[in-house]
């Protein structure tokens, strides 16, 4: 359970991107060699930076709460790691989301189109990959095998629920 709580910054980063997004489209309207948009209007620098910031702050808040409750929620380690590790997870998460959008455009799924696991897993997988590359001891301790699989199983229903909430708040055009 602690490892799932410590993964929250990767999950929150995507919601943070929706809330802070809308400015400075990453692909600037350009098309890939296949004639389709590289990413689409939904991927913006303001969302990328804002999502990373919100994910990082969320991780720091988890650190503060866990310290207050004597590490009952788990810990990232030191104060510096409480900033660095959530930053890595949030950056990986949003990079994975962008990669998923790139793949969706290549296979002909437009912005807002249902992508199934392409909407749900790339952000989690890339967050894991970034942790493995940049914070391997933390990754190996918290996310090796079973916990990683559990997170990949719970991500789709959580992702769906959050998207429905975003849709009802008029932050998303579609509820998926």
Curated annotation (Swiss-Prot):
Keywords linked to the UniProt accession: Cell membrane, Lipid biosynthesis, Lipid metabolism, Magnesium, Membrane, Phospholipid biosynthesis, Phospholipid metabolism, Transferase, Transmembrane, Transmembrane helix
Domain of life: Archaea
EC identifiers of the protein: 2.7.7.67
Transmembrane regions: 4-24, 49-69, 83-103, 115-135, 138-158
Gene Ontology CC terms: plasma membrane
GO biological process: glycerophospholipid biosynthetic process
Molecular function terms from GO: CDP-2,3-bis-(O-geranylgeranyl)-sn-glycerol synthase activity
UniProt catalytic activity: 2,3-bis-O-(geranylgeranyl)-sn-glycerol 1-phosphate + CTP + H(+) = CDP-2,3-bis-O-(geranylgeranyl)-sn-glycerol + diphosphate
Similarity section: Belongs to the CDP-archaeol synthase family.
Stated name of the protein: CDP-archaeol synthase
Gene label: carS
């Amino acid at each position: 359970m602690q490892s799932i709580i410590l993964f929250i910054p990767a999950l929150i980063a995507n919601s943070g991107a929706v809330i802070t997004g809308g400015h400075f489209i990453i692909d600037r309207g350009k098309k890939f060699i296949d004639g389709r948009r590289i990413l689409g209007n939904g991927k913006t620098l303001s969302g990328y930076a804002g999502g990373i910031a919100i994910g990082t702050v969320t991780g720091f808040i988890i650190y503060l709460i866990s310290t207050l409750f004597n590490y009952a929620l788990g810990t990232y380690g030191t104060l510096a790691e409480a900033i660095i590790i959530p930053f890595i997870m949030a950056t990986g998460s949003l990079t994975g989301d962008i990669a998923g959008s790139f793949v969706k455009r290549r296979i002909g799924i437009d912005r807002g189109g249902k992508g199934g696991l392409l909407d749900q897993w790339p952000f989690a997988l890339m967050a894991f990959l970034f942790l493995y590359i940049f914070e391997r001891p933390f990754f190996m301790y918290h996310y090796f095998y079973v916990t990683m699989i559990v997170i990949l199983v719970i991500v789709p229903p959580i992702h769906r629920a959050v998207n429905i909430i975003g849709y009802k708040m008029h932050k998303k055009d579609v509820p998926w």
